[in-house]
Design a protein with these regions (language model features):
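A short, conserved alpha-helix within the catalytic core of class I
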Residues: 213-229
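Core SAM-dependent methyltransferase catalytic element
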Residues: 346-358
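Rossmann-like AdoMet
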Residues: 2-130, 137-185, 197-202, 347
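A conserved beta-strand element that flanks and buttresses the S-adenosyl-L-methionine
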Residues: 206-207
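Conserved SAM/SAH-binding loop
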Residues: 185-192
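Short "lid" loop at the C-terminus of a central beta-strand within the Rossmann-like core
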Residues: 190, 239-245, 293
């Protein structure tokens, strides 16, 4: 693939897409390397009440104003200091667009994998499934449907920061299921993992769509370490870099990051930003959104926010680790080597590890 500059027609704001095929590691097209690392979202220490699971149909808020304040502070730093802007602001008021090649690949894997996972879990008297970054729960429903069909009770807790999406999906899931008790936790992955650790029974920690590991190496390891504890079964979906560098990379790259729906999702953060700041900082016509690719170490895609042609900050970085890199992460956190289930066309993989085995 050769480098190119392209402009995609859109509104509020315009979208400008940059891509370069062979920059050096850490270098971005059209500007100096970005060295500002994301600051971690402030965590309120879990108190006893925060660790109590939500009841069926409930969405329990354990972060509330902490998230609102930290998002506003992070946005202000990005505007004034040019620091990296984390992903929270994108998810707060916007639903993930869905329909990507990652979704297609994971769905195909889960159709085959879910019966095997179910057979391993069904004998446990208490089963908890915590999904980190649950979206609309469509993919996880492939597994939940089996519990319902066999009349085996389990508890399913969605962990997400989008309150509207949480309430909507918890309500819909409880209309669908009788044996699967569905609830929601309005909080970060760290909150979800702390709550999971406090529950009795067999816990399944799952995160699909590359959500858990799609971060810089240190944060990905932190998420994985928190997931691979006690007797947890871990189910993680992650797309490898060859999806973007192989024969169909050009097409898959566009399908992942440059669709009309995805563009709407990214632009939605600007509206959320205006609401958080209490004024119209992101004015239509003044801001453009570009992208930059680092092809290795690992493969990375970042969005660049320009104000009147000048780069102001970068955001929503997406990392793609290969099989060996992910396997090494499991080894680093002291977890068993994962099973790897593949969908070659989309380079999606689902990694499964049972932390205590059978």
């Amino acid at each position: 693939m050769s480098g190119y500059e392209e402009k995609i027609t859109s509104t509020d704001p315009k979208t400008r897409v940059f891509k370069q095929d062979t920059p050096s590691e850490g270098e971005f097209h059209g500007s100096a390397p970005c060295t500002s690392l994301p600051r971690p979202l402030p965590q309120s220490l879990p108190c006893t009440s925060d660790l109590l699971p939500p009841k069926k149909g409930q969405v329990k808020d354990v972060i509330g104003r902490v998230l609102e304040k930290s998002t506003k502070d992070s946005l202000r730093r990005s505007l004034t200091e040019g620091t990296y802007l984390g992903k929270e602001i994108f998810y707060l008021g916007n639903a993930w667009p869905g329909g990507s090649n990652q979704t297609d690949g994971e769905t195909e894997i889960l159709k085959t994998l879910a019966p095997d996972i179910f057979s391993r879990l069904r004998a446990y008297p208490i089963i908890w499934i915590f999904e980190l970054g649950a979206g609309d729960s469509t993919k996880m429903s492939i597994l939940l449907d089996l519990f319902e069909l066999e009349g085996i009770k389990c508890y399913y807790c969605r962990v997400d920061i989008n309150e509207e999406l949480q309430k909507k999906n918890v309500r819909q899931l409880n209309k669908k299921y009788t044996y699967v008790e569905c609830s929601g936790l309005l909080g970060t992955f760290e909150h979800g993992l702390a709550m999971a650790a406090a529950q009795a029974g067999k816990k399944v920690i799952t995160s699909l769509g590359s959500t858990l590991l799609n971060l810089d190496n240190s944060q990905a390891l932190k998420n994985l370490r928190g997931s691979c504890r006690d007797n947890n079964m871990v189910i993680i979906g992650h797309q490898g870099p060859e999806a973007m560098t192989g024969r169909d990379g050009e097409e898959l790259h566009r399908a992942s990051y440059h669709t009309k729906e995805y563009n709407k999702f990214i632009r939605g953060a600007l509206r959320t930003g205006n609401e958080a700041l209490g004024k119209e900082v992101f004015k239509a016509g003044e801001w453009e959104i570009g992208c930059a690719i680092t092809p290795k170490g690992p493969w990375s895609h970042d969005f660049i926010f320009y104000h009147q042609g000048e780069e102001r900050f970068r955001a929503f970085s997406s990392k793609k680790f290969n099989e060996q890199e992910v396997s090494d992460m499991f080894k680093t956190v002291g977890a068993p080597s994962p099973e790897i289930h593949r969908h070659p066309k989309t380079a999606m993989r689902i990694y499964v590890a049972d932390c205590l085995g059978d």
